[in-house]
Structures are given as structure tokens and as C-alpha cells.
Design a protein with these regions (language model features):
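Aromatic- and Gly/Pro-rich donor/ligand-binding loops
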Residues: 6-17, 21-166
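Hydrophobic alpha-helical packing residues
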Residues: 23, 30-31, 185, 274-279
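Short internal beta-strands
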Residues: 39-41, 146-148, 172-179, 249-253, ...
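A nucleotide-sugar donor-handling region in carbohydrate enzymes
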Residues: 95-109, 120-128, 141-142, 148-222, ...
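Short beta-strand scaffold positions
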Residues: 114, 176, 284-286, 304
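Catalytic donor nucleotide-activated moiety binding site of glycosyltransferases and closely related
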Residues: 143-153, 185, 227-229, 233-269
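Donor nucleotide-activated moiety binding/catalytic core segment of transferases
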Residues: 193-201, 205, 254-291
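Catalytic binding pocket for nucleotide-activated donors in carbohydrate/polymer assembly enzymes
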Residues: 295-305
Length: 305
């Protein structure tokens, strides 16, 4: 008897550390359970013509910024390098189905798993992109479940309720990453919704250690900062801490204004992200604690704002 063939629907087109690591962790856990699994490629969900148009204007804006602001050059250089590292990680560590013809999926898969991350975010920034049957497995009548799917909001917009309810009407199992998400989905669908942990917490530390490799042998001691928000207090705090203990300050490149604030602006993909945490004397972050709880333990210390 062959193993059940499963497909995961999540984000892999957004080069975000947490997004890609949750996709990796969930797939590894599914494979551990004995199922076959591929992540469906969502890179070309946006209409090709629209995507090409967007890319053109984005590049024009980037070149203008490079000319007007020299500090942006370092940020942009790191961004390009980081993107390459993300692509390498996705290629090397994720099993991806790059087929874009939805009609062929049911011939390949027996069951669909949707999640995690903010795959069902109804906010104005995301809704236009996410309001497609693809992100709800609406193209199939086969069994579908959600795992740790997040809404990213505290209340669901009334104007989208009917469609959201229809999208989830035939799900066999629903779960969410946050308590508020469980309540919202349960109220809308009338179904039981289970509160589950982020996929990164499904893997024990040994799995992450195997991925990261041995602890670095470098004797360099440094403070590592990973901030999702633009907060002057956070920045001043870590700079003062590094200065007080005579440590270099390394920061990930994700916020442009930090380009000149660190001793080293780090370009990283998911693997390098973990390795830098592993080698840090202390990690400062404002990332939700659950998202990187099992990962941040590799740092000798961690401080969450």
C-alpha cells in the first residue's frame, strides 16, 4: 500500500525567515509521519502581466533610491544576496511542486494541508492577493485540512464573511495558530477549530541542530538583532548594550533605516539566519515569541521586546 500523497498550500514566494522556516518545519513533520508531501508553488498566482508591470516599476524606484541615497546601496546589495540565499534554501531543503495547472493536482495528491502563517489574512494589504480559491484549496473536492492557519487580525471584515464561510465549508479539520483565530473561524463556520502550535515548534532541537550544523568555532562575540518593527527605543537599547559589553552588533538587513546602525548588516537566507542566532552571545528580537521559540534557544541568551 502506497503512502498517502499530500500537498501543502502555504506561502513560499515571500522571502521571510519565519514564513520559509514554518514551511520547512511542517513539511519535515509530515514526512516524519510517513506521508509523501510537496508544497504547491504559489509564486505565479499573481497574473503574469501584472507581475511584470510591478517588477518594472519596483526596479525603477530602486534605482532612483540608489542614486539619491548612498546608504540604500548597502541595503539593496544585501537584499539581492539574501534573495539568492532564500532561493538556495528553498531549492535544497523544500520539496516543491512547480506545476501551475491546478487541474492536474488531484491526479497527484490525495489530501491537501493549508497553512500555516497568515495564509488567510483579510487585511487590505493582503486580501487582493490572498482572495483566491488557491489559498483555500478551493480547486478540489478532495479531503482538506488546515494546520495553524493564521488570520493576522482580531476581527474578520463583515464584507468578506460569506465568501470565507464558503471557502471553509468542506474542510474536514480546522486549526489555527492563535486563540483569537480559533474563535473567529469557529464563529464564522460553526465548526470546531483546534488551537495548535506554530510548525517550528513541531520539530525538536535535534532536528534544527542537524540542519544548522555544528556550533561555530569562531571566537568572535556579537550581539544579534532581528527587528520586524521600526522602533528607535529597541535600536538605542541594543546599541547601548553592545557598547557596554564591548560586543560587535550584527543586524539583519530587513529594515532599510538600520543600514548604518550596525557594525555589520547581515545578508541571510533561512539557514544563515539560524546559524547567526546559533553563534550570537545574545539575540534581541521583537518577533512573536512562539514563532521562533524552538529556534532562538540556540542563542546563548535571548531578549524579547
Amino acid at each position: 500500500m502506497r503512502n498517502k500523497r499530500t500537498a501543502t498550500i502555504t506561502w513560499v514566494k515571500h522571502y521571510n525567515f519565519g514564513t520559509i522556516l514554518q514551511a520547512y518545519a511542517l513539511q519535515q513533520y509530515i514526512l516524519y509521519l510517513g506521508y509523501e508531501n510537496h508544497i504547491l508553488n504559489d509564486t505565479y498566482i499573481i497574473e503574469p502581466d501584472q507581475k511584470k508591470s510591478n517588477i518594472f516599476f519596483i526596479r525603477v524606484i530602486q534605482w532612483v533610491k540608489l542614486l539619491l541615497n548612498p546608504s540604500f546601496k548597502l541595503y539593496y546589495k544585501n537584499k539581492v544576496k539574501s534573495k539568492k540565499l532564500f532561493i538556495r534554501f528553498i531549492t535544497d531543503y523544500l520539496l516543491i511542486d512547480y506545476d501551475t495547472d491546478w487541474r492536474l493536482f488531484d491526479d497527484k495528491y490525495d489530501q491537501y494541508i493549508v497553512g500555516s502563517d497568515q495564509i488567510w489574512n483579510p487585511g487590505p494589504i493582503w486580501y487582493k492577493e490572498l482572495n483566491t480559491p488557491f489559498y483555500y484549496a478551493g480547486f478540489t473536492n478532495k479531503k482538506k485540512i488546515s494546520y495553524a492557519s493564521s488570520l493576522g487580525v482580531s476581527a474578520y471584515p463583515d464584507k468578506h464573511l460569506k465568501q470565507f464561510r464558503e471557502y471553509l465549508s468542506d474542510y474536514k479539520y480546522l486549526s489555527a495558530r492563535e486563540d483569537i483565530g480559533c474563535k473567529i473561524i469557529a464563529d464564522i463556520t460553526g465548526k470546531e477549530v483546534t488551537h495548535v502550535v506554530d510548525p517550528t515548534l513541531l520539530l525538536p532541537s535535534d532536528n534544527w541542530r542537524k540542519l544548522i550544523g555544528e556550533k561555530p568555532t569562531s571566537h568572535e562575540k556579537y550581539v544579534l538583532a532581528y527587528f520586524l518593527s521600526d522602533n528607535k527605543y529597541y535600536l538605542d537599547y541594543v546599541r547601548q548594550y553592545a557598547s557596554k559589553y564591548h560586543l560587535s552588533l550584527k543586524m539583519f538587513h530587513n529594515l532599510k533605516k538600520y543600514s548604518c546602525c550596525a557594525d555589520e548588516l547581515v545578508a541571510a537566507g533561512p539557514l544563515e539566519f539560524l546559524q547567526y542566532i546559533d553563534g550570537a552571545s545574545i539575540l534581541f528580537t521583537d518577533s512573536p515569541s512562539q514563532k521562533i521559540k524552538s529556534i532562538r534557544d540556540f542563542a546563548q541568551g535571548c531578549f524579547s521586546f
